[in-house]
UniProtKB/Swiss-Prot annotation:
It is an enzyme of class 3 (hydrolase). Induction: Expression occurs in a growth-phase-dependent manner with optimal expression at post-exponential phase. Its EC number is 3.4.22.-. GO terms for cellular component: extracellular region. It is found in: Secreted, Cell wall; Secreted. This is Extracellular cysteine protease.
Amino acid sequence: MYAEYVNQLKNFRIRETQGYNSWCAGYTMSALLNATYNTNRYNAESVMRYLHPNLRGHDFQFTGLTSNEMLRFGRSQGRNTQYLNRMTSYNEVDQLTTNNQGIAVLGKRVESSDGIHAGHAMAVAGNAKVNNGQKVILIWNPWDNGLMTQDAHSNIIPVSNGDHYEWYASIYGY
């Protein structure tokens, strides 16, 4: 793939991937805050422990987060996180990335609304123009060791296990 333009969060790195748990939002926020603060002090487990200090064992392993908890955590870390009831546009991603503001993707699985991964959070690492001007958004799925490119005109995200997620909302400002 030929990239004629790439705009990525300068310090975005994949430091950990999601195992058998429901912590996708923790992984997403950790990656975004580590990037925008240029640190490595955040990790998914500590984020989840901060938000659910009294859960233990199976209950802790399989707790997820609400969008309000994600907003609250971002704000507790000095960020003015905001909820957007839709996918962010290519131009919004470009501007937020340029301004070193991370974006979380909130997705609903298209195939089934049941099970451990019915809802899923992913991180926007930036945006690019590839293959003669096709606009794409660079997304990190916490299950994966690399970034994927998402057509900027589609809110349906195919992921590595074969499922598809509808990008129904965003939280930006991490």
